[in-house]
């Protein structure tokens, strides 16, 4: 079973949204497991102190290396599990990483707070820093939920159809094509005729063209990478 362990100072935040919809139903069905642990339980003093002032001065507080290391050691049960630290300075999370994580045993995720985490525990416990975007939140809990939700929906049996995630944004390097449903007319805007034609080949070609156009317009970085791997087909005969 895919299992994720979350280390946090606010365990009451979980499962939160992960207890609803696809992830929630899958959790109840036993398709994945969530282990949430309070970092404060690893504090040594009676005040359950987990942070201290930054060496060299500066604002805020820093999560202590000794406390977090103890929490990681107490929670870890497999050396093969990825150890992640949700951090705005981490490498951007991508769909390919999500696919890889969902295919493994499930990660241990550290949710940071304060000004950050003592660098020594990041190095000593091999924490891979992961970011969900170029912005700063109050803590790592919401990013951790986003990562877990993205992984869980790819687990076997979670989505209704195996192909449900096949054409989603990023699955093939492109953003997803526009979607439509009834009514056929909405405020003078019709569903494109091609989608009602019943010609599956033409529908597929339309969707591919729309996905390419959207990606090129909205995510030139993705488009450049995709176009480099998918050069235009030559019309000349060999």
Curated annotation (Swiss-Prot):
Pfam families hit by this protein: tRNA_m1G_MT (PF01746)
CDD domains in the cross-refs: TrmD-like
EC number in record: 2.1.1.228
Residues annotated for S-adenosyl-L-methionine binding in this entry: 132-137
Top EC class for this record: transferase
Gene3D superfamilies named among the record's database cross-references: 3.40.1280.10, tRNA(m1g37)methyltransferase, domain 2
GO-annotated biological processes: tRNA N1-guanine methylation
Assembly behavior: Homodimer.
Keyword Transferase: yes
Subcellular location: Cytoplasm
GO molecular function (one): tRNA (guanine(37)-N1)-methyltransferase activity
Family statement: Belongs to the RNA methyltransferase TrmD family.
One GO cellular component term: cytosol
Keywords: Cytoplasm, Methyltransferase, S-adenosyl-L-methionine, Transferase, tRNA processing
Record protein name field: tRNA (guanine-N(1)-)-methyltransferase
Disulphide-bonded residues: none
Keyword Cytoplasm: yes
Domain of life assignment: Bacteria
Species annotation: Nitrobacter hamburgensis (strain DSM 10229 / NCIMB 13809 / X14)
HAMAP family to which the protein is assigned, alphabetical: TrmD
Encoding gene, per UniProt annotation: trmD
Role, per record: Specifically methylates guanosine-37 in various tRNAs.
Classification via InterPro entries: Alpha/beta_knot_MTases, tRNA_m1G_MeTrfase_C_sf, tRNA_m1G_MeTrfase_TrmD, tRNA_m1G_MTases_N, tRNA_MeTrfase_TRMD/TRM10
Catalytic activity entry: guanosine(37) in tRNA + S-adenosyl-L-methionine = N(1)-methylguanosine(37) in tRNA + S-adenosyl-L-homocysteine + H(+)
